[in-house]
Amino acid sequence: MSTDQPNGEPRRYKIDPDPAWDLYDEEDGVLSVELSWVPDPLAGRPPELVASPELVTALSAEGLTGYTTGAARGYYNEYTPAAEEGAAVPELVRLIVGEDPAADFSFVRSQGLTVSERALALLQARCQNLTVRPAG
């Protein structure tokens, strides 16, 4: 990976995380998601994202910027294959991404979810279902 684009700005990447749910609701600041399967450490349909507590700890330990966290909970409906197989519902943390294009994480509707090279390296090491494209 190259650190800079031809214009000298740091290279950014557009990512699409694991789309692990179709239904969600927010009540009293808690994002509730009906999981379709056991999600990747980063999952969602931007701008609504959830992460595993382990991923959030890693993001913080690396000093990555551009996000805050909030409450989230996942659940399976009775027809979800994961529920039928007896999979436990994972603990989730809401990942709220800001709009600062200079931060490691950024979400702007016209551009989608973009990340820095540092953030991408960490996500690629931990996530299996992550689509990556050059931003811009």
Model regions and ranges:
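Acidic (Asp/Glu-rich) sequence patches and key acidic residues
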Residues: 1-136
